[in-house]
Amino acid sequence: VPVPRLIPIAHEADYRTDRIGHYDDGLFLASAWDHHAYVHLFDRDGAYRRSTITRVADRAALAEALDGLLAGLSGMSYGDIAIQLFQTHQDDVTFGLIDESGDRAGDGSHVDWVELYPDRLGFHEPWDGLYDT
C-alpha cells in the first residue's frame, strides 16, 4: 500500500507521541530533541502551516521550553492526528515527516516508509498511527 496523503500518528500518553493533538486552529505535533523544543502546526485537514523551534543551551530547560510553546495554543487537547508530509530546517537539523520509501534493506525489495525527524519514528503499513523506532 503506497504512502497515504495523510499519515496517522497515534497519541501515546507519557511516551514519544504524548504531545500531539488538536487546538482551535487545527492540529499540532510537539516534542523535544537534543537541545530543541518545537511545535509543528497544521490546518484541520493536516496540511503543514509552520513550525516554532526553540534552541535551549541547557537540556534541563527543554520541558519548560516545550510547555511554553504549547501554552500559546488555545483550545488544546491531546489525541490522535493525521498530517501530510512536510520538511523544515533549523540549526542544521531537519524537522519533518519525510517519505523514505524504497529499498531500505538493500535487497531490492520496496518498502513504503515515512520517518519523523529528528525523533526517528518510522511509520508504515498498515498506516494505523503506530510507529517503529
Task: Label the predicted regions.
Residues 1-133:
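Sequence signature of WD/YWTD-type beta-propeller architectures
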